[in-house]
UniProtKB/Swiss-Prot annotation:
It comes from Bordetella avium (strain 197N). HAMAP family: TolB. Belongs to the TolB family. The keyword Signal applies. Residues 1-39 form the signal peptide. InterPro entries: 6-blade_b-propeller_TolB-like, PD40, Tol-Pal_TolB, TolB_N. It holds the Pfam family TolB_N. The gene is tolB. The Tol-Pal system is composed of five core proteins: the inner membrane proteins TolA, TolQ and TolR, the periplasmic protein TolB and the outer membrane protein Pal. They form a network linking the inner and outer membranes and the peptidoglycan layer. This is Tol-Pal system protein TolB.
């Protein structure tokens, strides 16, 4: 990957945008019986959440193959959070129309029971009915019906898992969201979009030149990214539904590190048009001239908006080594946020604005760290030697990042408290640049 000046790396500041080309978590893959295995994945999970909810998830009645596949996706979704303990529901015979024996399930150790049915109509569409029971309170927590085609069944399973997760934890689930990443195979780069568990990958863009720094628009309809196909780094915005793309930052020098404003109307970018890399604001449709935000004697790069849209968090070496700063959209003095260690890069802010995520060099290793902004407490979430490219889930409960194990690039995930970790290795190609999409419903 070409060296770009507006970024940081271990060897020198001028190499750092190459750190964008690392791996992403396809957050855990479980294949459905009705879907071919288009990716070869190995998943390992370690750790559990501070609280584990015991739940039985029965195969959906009415169609043995599809009913079992639906339940397997739901089980896999909930299992990888580390917050649920599965109770065996084999042979339960539960249907949505039969009464549930709360005491029996409670005796088996299940506080919650999820079950349902699936049937196919004359038009070929499937009706899926689902129920969630609380065996402690002896009532039904949730119940809803879905209708969809065969290719939509997996997404419906994710939606059911989202409902279960939210009803029990009070936090919105992210199983039906999407991720984007760059797949490098040989001399070809592909910008791909997939389900949060890595299934159903779709190619949004293919190029012989590098593609880096993909980032989702707030409504999930577009991706901004950096492409080198014109011979230098240029920031583009692509509409996923039409694949139409427009350049939004194509100025003198390097154009890099796009980040969407919360309202989707603007992008923060790093430009070298006036010399060293500095932070600018450009319009998301490419219609306005760039507005400069930072003016420092050092290199400023890797911007990200705060959730309220009033300020930008970015990486700068103005203090000597790369650290993370915050500045208002009106410019002015920047406030330093990180003080532990001499090297902190790649900032990401949690959806509620309370936690900063970044790559920290500690004891010669590069790890994903989180900083509680109100208290100033730093927590190292990972323990690898080369962990990079963190990205928050839209509910703030999980983090995607890139790791290296046994000399190979793998995708990894960690819960926001560091208790539950996952690794996922891909056999073919290199998967880079994790970015988790927003809620879209």
């Amino acid at each position: 990957m070409p060296t770009m000046t507006p970024a940081f790396s271990r060897a020198s500041l001028s190499e750092a945008l190459r750190s964008y080309g690392l791996a992403l978590l396809l957050f855990l893959a479980t294949l459905l019986a009705w879907q071919p295995a288009h990716a070869q994945l190995r998943v390992d999970i370690s750790g559990t959440g501070a609280t584990q909810y015991p739940i039985a998830i029965a195969d959906f009645a009415g169609d043995d193959v599809r009913g079992r596949a639906l339940a397997e996706v739901i089980r896999a979704d909930l299992t990888r959070t580390g917050q649920f303990r599965l109770i065996n529901a084999a042979g339960s015979g539960l249907t949505v129309d039969s009464p549930i024996n709360y005491d029996d399930w409670r005796g088996r150790g299940a506080d919650y029971v999820a079950y349902g049915s699936i049937s196919q109509g004359a038009d070929g569409r499937f009706e899926i009915r689902y129920r969630l029971a609380d065996t402690v309170k002896k009532n039904q927590l949730d119940g809803v019906a879905f209708s969809g085609t065969e290719p939509e069944l997996r997404r419906i399973a994710h939606q059911i898992a989202d409902r279960i997760y939210e009803k029990i934890t009070g936090v919105r689930g992210v199983f039906a969201t999407r991720i984007a990443y760059v797949l490098k195979q040989g001399n070809t780069y592909e910008l791909q979009v997939a389900d949060a568990d890595g299934q159903n990958p779709q190619v949004a863009l293919r190029s012989r030149e590098p593609i880096i720094s993909p980032t989702w628009s707030p409504d999930g309809s577009k991706l901004a990214y950096v492409s080198f196909h014109s011979g230098k780094p240029v920031v583009y915005v692509q509409t996923l539904a039409t694949r139409s793309q427009i350049p939004v930052a194509n100025f003198k020098g390097n154009n890099s590190a796009p980040a969407w404003s919360p309202d989707g109307s603007q992008l923060a970018v790093a430009l070298t048009q006036d010399g060293l890399s500095q932070i600018y604001i450009v319009s998301a449709d490419g219609s306005a001239k760039p507005r400069r935000i930072t003016r420092s004697p050092g290199i400023d790069t890797e911007p990200t908006f705060t959730p309220d849209g009033r300020s930008i968090i970015f990486t700068s070496d103005r203090s000597g080594g790369p650290q993370i700063y915050q500045v208002g959209l009106d410019g002015g003095d920047a406030r330093r946020l990180t003080f532990n260690g001499s090297y902190n890069i790649s900032p990401r802010i949690s959806p509620d604005g309370s936690t900063l995520l970044y790559v920290a060099r500690r004891d010669g290793a590069f790890r994903i760290a989180s900083l509680n902004l109100p208290t100033g407490t730093e927590t190292l979430l990972t323990d690898g030697r080369d962990d990079q490219s963190p990205s928050f889930a839209p509910n703030g409960m999980q983090v995607l990042y890139a790791a290296t194990q046994n000399g190979r690039s793998v995708l990894a995930g960690v819960s926001s408290d560091g208790r539950v970790r996952q690794t996922l290795s891909v056999l073919n190609g290199e998967i880079r640049e994790p970015t988790w999409g927003p809620f879209t419903r």
